[in-house]
Amino acid sequence: MLRLYSTPAGLIVERDGAFFPVPQALTLDALFSAADPAALLLAALLDARPIAGGDHKGTLLAPLQSQEVWAAGVTYYRSRTARMAESKDSGGDTFYDKVYEADRPEIFFKATPHRVAAPGGGVRIRSDSRWNVPEPELTLAINSAGKIFGY
């Protein structure tokens, strides 16, 4: 298995417990556009020498370059009730009924790259917000051909 890390110094790949620098010519944009991102990454590492690893994990960046972040799905059932209650006054509570009973998941825009927090990074919550409902997320890296190549 390959693990790809984005760091301030560049991309780093972990393979079989060893860490390798990715040539700077190979970008995250190129990986997202490649038909086979893993093969492209492996080819770029043919002449790579291992580097000291593990120390980069405190300085990870979000693993995207110019990609927008989109989401698919619905919120957890417990949150559904809260969201329906909060939107009832505006008449939007029926919106969630439609989302939960749809044949396919809802697709919605989440963020542009500069608004994505790095792993372990802080998030901003509006000062006028009375409450916040954090939920776990699973993120998939999907190339331009629709193939999942990372998570």
Residues covered by each model-derived region:
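Generic N-terminal segment detector
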Residues: 1-72
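Active-site microenvironments in enzyme catalytic cores
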Residues: 40-151
